[in-house]
A protein has these predicted regions:
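Conserved AdoMet/S-adenosylmethionine-binding subsite of the radical SAM
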Residues: 1-118, 123
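A structural motif corresponding to the C-terminal lobe/cap of the Radical SAM core domain
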Residues: 105, 113-114, 128-154
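Radical SAM enzyme core and accessory elements
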Residues: 156-166
Length: 166
């Protein structure tokens, strides 16, 4: 939605033609933009990387207040829109129980949301090479079972059956 001037007319036309629509977002856009898009969407993939704003700022360069506010509004104001929250589980950043419990509490009570913990991978390292930028994660890897543990804690905390969360 960073290019809302292009995306919104496309979404509007797709909806008019009864074409299913979806977006993938981190939610770091003005609420009015997301709200306008939501009325034309069938599905939203919404990344939540961290619940703690200071940690989010440290890891991404921006706080998460706008992101979490937008997600809460989206879930509340568009209860018929299916939202799939996803978290790339990053070693040392959000691979802990504190994050999982906080996210589970945040999602609790919303029936229109699924959750998926995505295991960390190194598939994006070539982009850093292409941009001549150092890849700061080095050879870090996510231990087996960590993403599954985060998934289980979020599901249990929010009261979702594991099958319903995918």
């Amino acid at each position: 939605l960073m290019h809302a001037d292009i995306a919104l007319p496309l979404l509007r036309e797709a909806r008019h033609r009864r074409i299913k629509t979806a977006i993938e977002t981190c939610g770091c856009v003005p609420w009015e933009t997301l709200k306008e898009a939501a009325q034309y969407l069938n599905y939203v993939l919404f990344d939540v990387k961290q619940m703690d704003s200071a940690k989010h700022r440290e890891g991404t360069g921006v706080g998460n207040e706008l992101i979490l506010s937008n997600l809460k509004k989206l879930l509340t104001e568009f209860p018929n829109l299916h939202v799939q929250v996803r978290t790339p589980i990053i070693p040392g950043f959000n691979d802990n129980d504190e994050f999982a419990y906080a996210l589970g509490e945040f999602l609790k009570g919303h029936e229109n949301v699924g959750y998926e913990a995505l295991p960390y991978h190194r598939l994006g390292t070539q982009k850093y090479d292409f941009l001549s930028r150092p890849y700061l994660m080095g050879d870090v890897s996510l231990p087996d079972g960590v993403a599954q543990r985060v998934q289980r804690i979020v599901d249990e905390t929010r009261g979702a059956a594991p099958e319903a969360a995918k």
